């Protein structure tokens, strides 16, 4: 345990520069599924709304379906594509045996993705190691995203993946606005003050609640069929 109260691992760093508040916003929430089709259909039934089509990520060997929540935030359901071999370790810890076991038991939150203006500066100053910045594209969409070489997630997904859309467009621009709303994202951690300090460094994020306890990530959603709390214990 270091002075910040966080157990050291390869994803966390000491702050290397004076505190600098960055501009950021939640970009999207990531739900992992073992089978994309059947588990998206189950969510559509639970929520009472259809998901939009997503696409494939050939480099990662994954595919997804999307749902616009509000403003510029969307929900992504992602799964390994059984017809595609990845060209590298899959992102969002999807090749990790623990993640595979969790997804075998049903759909679970994997992580959340934070949109930043300057991804290289944010990566340098965020106070943890979100991974290397890689370029991705699908159709006319292009983006930069942080992915560790081992495909892992910082603090198991509690700390955000960073993303930048160079063209200023993210999928929410063309998705159908749904009645499903993110009320808040709940983070539970043994040292909540340490997580809060890092997130404050990344910018004001009013949709995030941080509580003390065993590591967990929970998406709280309001839908036409009621409120849902989608939770992963990490």
Predicted segments with their positions:
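A short beta-turn/loop motif at secondary-structure boundaries
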Residues: 57-60
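Glyoxalase I/VOC metalloenzyme domain signal
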Residues: 21-26, 32-50, 62, 69-234
């Amino acid at each position: 345990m270091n002075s910040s109260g966080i157990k050291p691992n390869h994803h966390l760093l000491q702050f290397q520069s004076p505190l600098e508040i960055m501009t950021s916003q939640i970009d999207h929430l990531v739900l992992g599924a073992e089978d994309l089709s059947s588990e998206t259909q189950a969510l559509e039934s639970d929520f009472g709304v259809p998901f939009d089509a997503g696409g494939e990520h050939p480099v990662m060997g994954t595919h997804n379906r999307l749902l616009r929540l509000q403003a510029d935030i969307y929900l992504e359901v992602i799964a390994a594509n059984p017809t595609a071999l990845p060209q590298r370790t899959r992102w969002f810890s999807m090749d990790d045996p623990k993640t595979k076991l969790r997804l075998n038991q049903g759909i679970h939150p994997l992580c959340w993705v934070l949109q930043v203006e300057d991804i290289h500066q944010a990566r340098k100053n965020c106070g943890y190691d979100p991974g290397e910045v890689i370029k991705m594209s699908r159709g006319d969409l292009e983006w930069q995203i942080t992915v560790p070489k081992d495909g892992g997630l910082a603090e198991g997904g509690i700390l955000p993946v960073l993303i930048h859309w160079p063209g200023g467009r993210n999928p929410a621009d063309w998705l159908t606005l749904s009645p499903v709303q993110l009320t808040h994202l709940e983070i539970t951690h043994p040292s909540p003050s340490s997580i809060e300090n890092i997130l404050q460094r990344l910018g004001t994020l009013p949709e995030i609640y941080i509580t003390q306890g065993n590591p967990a990530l929970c998406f709280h959603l309001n839908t036409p069929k009621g409120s849902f709390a989608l939770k992963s214990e990490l």
